[in-house]
């Protein structure tokens, strides 16, 4: 965006006054429409990770607030997700070896703006948030005002909803860990043992299995993918193959099943030193 240079100059000047170092990166391929929100997020967090390693930092604070959490939950409810996905953004999470903290998650944007104005702290407005081209912005502009009219503290309800789901998923995770010890053999799913569990536990196990593989990219998967994964495991076919997003291949063979990254063959050149030409006449 053309406004990026102005925003960068603003942040640079402000931090210089406070004697706080600034790390700034431009990502050339980060163009509108080229990446989904999830892919763009992955690019940003990978860069954050590199900076943390460069400065030997193991904690990263982000500015996510309560409205971000509400928007994320609503987006996932509309698109479909897992129980963990519906919980939205966590106050504490982990990205590889870095701990992510979100200290503003209990405050909404209006409260943050109020604090900035009261303390005479300058800020800039991100104009890309004004467009309704993205579903997150449409939720922000059209749905959140309706929720605020019904309950000015709607965001606190979404925060409580998120925390409740996280508590429940933690309990489920404890049970899943027991199932994994029984069902996983050399990181492969023993289908006969898998079938011994209730449908609810099978579903929870599959959600966890896919999450452990996709991690931050779990939003690439929908409820449809989970159902396909379940049906392949429980189906009568002894041998089955299916391609999942991001080049993961489901393989079912000889009573076991697993996901693996598709192997890509890199282009190569081989020079023939001795050869024979056959005349087909």
Predicted regions: what they are:
Residues 18, 55, 150, 213-217, ...:
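Solvent-exposed amphipathic alpha-helical surface segments
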Residues 78-79, 148, 210-214:
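Hydrophobic/aromatic-lined pockets within catalytic cores
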Residues 188-280:
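Mid-to-C-terminal catalytic/tRNA-binding core of tRNA(Ile)-lysidine synthase
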